[in-house]
């Protein structure tokens, strides 16, 4: 008695069709399909940007460096 029979489902579908009509339901399904396509396209765009690696930066250890400032007071001062 707690489960819905086939007659319950037929009545529910009939009420939905009467309230929304054929045109609104098909428009709604078209909007849902368009949203799914847009979502999938967004996922594919994200994957394309994720696949593109950043350029590798190399460090040249033998490159000349700028002269470091020299300290003139080498010793410690006693107080």
Swiss-Prot record:
InterPro entries: TatA/B/E (IPR003369), TatA/E (IPR006312)
Keywords: Cell inner membrane, Cell membrane, Membrane, Protein transport, Translocation, Transmembrane, Transmembrane helix, Transport
Main location: membrane
Location in or out of the cell: Cell inner membrane
Membrane topology recorded in Swiss-Prot or TrEMBL: Single-pass membrane protein
Record-level Gene Ontology MF annotations: protein transmembrane transporter activity
Keyword Transmembrane attached: yes
Biased composition (Basic and acidic residues): 43-60
GO cellular component entries: TAT protein transport complex
GO biological process, alphabetically ordered: protein transport by the Tat complex
Regions that span the bilayer: 1-21
Keyword presence, Cell membrane: yes
Region of interest: Disordered: 43-79
Functional description taken from the UniProt entry: Part of the twin-arginine translocation (Tat) system that transports large folded proteins containing a characteristic twin-arginine motif in their signal peptide across membranes. TatA could form the protein-conducting channel of the Tat system.
NCBIfam families: PRK00720.1, tatAE
Family recorded in the similarity comment: Belongs to the TatA/E family.
Quaternary structure note: The Tat system comprises two distinct complexes: a TatABC complex, containing multiple copies of TatA, TatB and TatC subunits, and a separate TatA complex, containing only TatA subunits. Substrates initially bind to the TatABC complex, which probably triggers association of the separate TatA complex to form the active translocon.
HAMAP family hit by this protein: TatA_E (MF_00236)
The protein's name: Sec-independent protein translocase protein TatA
Organism for this UniProt entry: Rhodopseudomonas palustris (strain BisB5)
């Amino acid at each position: 008695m707690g489960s819905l029979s086939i007659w319950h489902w037929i009545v529910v579908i009939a009420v939905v069709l009467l309230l929304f009509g054929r045109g609104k339901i098909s428009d709604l399904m078209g909007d849902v399909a368009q949203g799914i396509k847009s979502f999938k396209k967004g996922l594919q765009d994200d994957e394309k940007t994720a696949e593109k690696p950043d350029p590798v930066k190399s460090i040249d250890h033998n490159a000349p460096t700028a002269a470091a400032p020299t300290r003139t007071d080498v010793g410690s001062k006693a107080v």
